[in-house]
Amino acid sequence: RKREKEIKIEFKNGIECTTKYNEREVYLLVYKKKKKNIRLLELLDKLKKERVERTEKILKKLEKYKCYISMEDLQKEVKGDLISRAHIANAMMAKGFVYSKAEAFKIYLRTGGLASEPKKELNALEAVSFIKRIGGIASLAHPKLTGLSGGTLEKLVILLKEQGLDAIEVYYPEQTQKETEIYKILCDKFGLLYTGGSDFHGMNRPDTLLGSKGISEEELTKIKNR
């Protein structure tokens, strides 16, 4: 980010957060107009602490199956300041408890797995309302992953729109062109902006290339002017 002007890449402040709607995971993209927002930072700090607590519980459960992973082991896998189940899987591979990340999730880390631990998640509607109160821009991320379609997806969009939803992520690498068009129609119907991207997650998703998907200059300008 320090080389933003030098390499001629414009950065925008934002985060992705996981929320819940009727027991389904709903992902939201939050674009911030300010670099720092005290209320948002306080919420993120709370969520970070809850994530650490969840991680510690998962590690405790893994001990029952002779998979001994310490927080120090995990730190070797983490480049940022957030620990995820993917990092736990990497640590399990490094110590020889599993052969692959897929095996770690299938047996231990997936929802319902031997060492699974439920996440404390925000309510989707309350999250959008909060984002708008702090002056952020809220976009429904990769709607395909909600598992909703047709009328049920439209109902969710209506409810989120009532709370101030600004956009839908219509461009996403793991969906068909037909699905992209469906999400564009939803945006046009409810006066929402288009967002999109490659959903790059570093080496956790090595097959997804940074910048492989994105929005046009015109679509970006609309978001900036929101």
Regions found by a protein language model. Give the residues of each.
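Structural recognition of alpha->loop->beta junctions
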Residues: 156-171, 210-226
